[in-house]
Amino acid sequence: MGIEWEGVKVEIGELVVEGDSESEMEGPTRRELLPWDRTLASVYDLAVVPGDSEEERREVARTIVTLCCEGTAGLISTARLVVELLRQTGENLDPGFDAETPLPLYETLLGSSPECADDLEAGLSYAERELTSSVSELLRSHSLKGYESVAMHAGAIGLLAMEIADATPSTLMEVTESEEVFEIGTDDLPRRPTVLLVGHLPLLGHIITEELGTLARQVELVGLTHTAWPNREDHVRVVGPLSMYHEYLSSGFADVVVVDGACPGEDVIEAAREGGSKLVATVGARVADLLDVTDYPVEEAVEVLVTEEDAVYVEEPIKAVEIAAWAALRVEGSRDRREPPRRAFRVGPPTRLTDVVIRNVGVPVVAGNIPGIVVLVSCPEKSADVEEPAKIAEVLLERGYLVLVPGCLAVALGSYLDDDGKTLYERYPDTLLNTGPCTSAAHLVGACIRVGVIFGKLPIRGEFVRVADYVLNRVGACVIAWGGEYSEHLVSAAYGVTRWGIPVVLGPDPEAGSLLVEKNPKVIDACSGEEVEDPTPEHLRCVVSDWKEAAITAARLCMRPNDTPEGRQNKVESYVELYRELYGELPPDLDLLIRDESDIPVTLRSEIRELLEETGWTPRSRASDPTLLPEG
């Protein structure tokens, strides 16, 4: 029995019984992790969803599960594509950065470290099996907390697929690396037949140009994808972020567009028609009812595309690009040449968080000299959408936070300039890091796990709950997901991140205040077994109304029960200064964040003491070994 969903085929086969030789590759099921989900739900208000009645709220929760499953299905499809390409090349797995534990999500869930395509295949088989289980839960009636558990499980599985997809292109890509800010854009595109690759295909540009041979040199191969690299002749030239695809397609500057199974939806066909471009959809593309010319000879497929159809489907990606290139040569002289959007992006060099980087960053994060790590994720669809996430990044960078940006936002930030014409990358080269493709979001979660491996000697193989508990109570990081609308990939990732113990801030939503129910999180001191009041982080997932609230909330959610007095002082000082800058007063919740006198920053001692006296604050004990697990 099996199901197919967005290019993912999930088969339910035989069960692996205990003692089987393959059992060591079996990852945890949702039911095995349900106690952890219930622990999180008992401490944090995760299952808070809008609705006037219980029935309406449950329907919203069910929709969230559906989005998480759709997002995870797409991520698995992407991972399968790149793993198959890895298998075809025969290359050994090389994640592209120096780390003793390069794929920590895989190692935590599956209990081993992958070394080749077959190992990655085993990880995807597990992901597909658990996705099937999550989909089947949609047929059952759950409580809000039950749907929350299913959504988090689907999201966590999606992050595993992300990690696999992120590791593989590092082996396959051959792009020019840069140690400095570099510029991409459309300003100097030559006027010749143009093929625009939209999605993941630009990452494999060197394979495409090699396969197409002289044909590749007769056309201009340009791309919209979720990362960028300096231009080179034998690769696809990136001209903008994937999230802005509608703006680029509708401009009509490309003669033919090739779209794969990345983020774009069915509106790509309409956008291409609006621009007068032909379109070729390939594996995973979310389009329907196109003529499938996969089995046609190339010449016949080109003829059909040029003379009969506006858009066709080709299953094999390289063949799809070949058909597009020949078609571009045919149609280029028969259509009005249009100008591309005039866009330029000065992008910071993609940075991998190696063990060396984590060691250098880990100590100041623990000490509070770096008050926290904030991962900022957004999918700006047009230039105006960049301003708010850029402002969030800017105010956090000014206060010393380490800000990591993956995917389309990492590219789009290259268009946000100050009065002197400088980008944030040029102003904050050491603390604003472009981490690469959007799939690197999983690598960012993995970096939090590797902090525990490097500094806490944390055993991770098969230890999901122990790892998530460590991250939640000791690693001062949070994620901000920003935008008017979220793709299903982003929804899936947001719920998966929560499962790993990393707080997520969502926004903007003008109705945000009505969605928050306050709790008073407590932790257990494993040394004494006593329950200790320490609402840091105060939320694991929350919705905010505007960019200022997002920045403030992120600063607060980077505090942890394990903070040393010096570390908490520095975090409180950064939080107070940021709050004052944005709102002109002291934050009203300092009584929740200051455990005793040693947490009060020296430079703010008198005024904070005065505020604490007004609130009736009394010192609290601190947990020397914080955990949410009763057994410690």
From Swiss-Prot:
This protein's name: Putative acetyl-CoA decarbonylase/synthase complex subunit alpha-like
Organism expressing this protein natively: Methanopyrus kandleri (strain AV19 / DSM 6324 / JCM 9639 / NBRC 100938)
A GO term, aspect molecular function: metal ion binding
Pfam families assigned: Prismane
Cited SUPFAM superfamilies: Prismane protein-like
Protein family membership: Belongs to the Ni-containing carbon monoxide dehydrogenase family.
Function description: Part of the ACDS complex that catalyzes the reversible cleavage of acetyl-CoA, allowing autotrophic growth from CO(2). The alpha-epsilon subcomponent functions as a carbon monoxide dehydrogenase.
Binding site for [Ni-4Fe-4S] cluster: 200, 226, 263, 379, 408, 438
Alphabetical UniProt keywords: Iron, Iron-sulfur, Metal-binding, Nickel
Domain of life: Archaea
Biological processes, Gene Ontology terms: response to hydrogen peroxide
InterPro entries linked to this entry: HCP/CODH, Prismane-like_a/b-sand, Prismane-like_sf
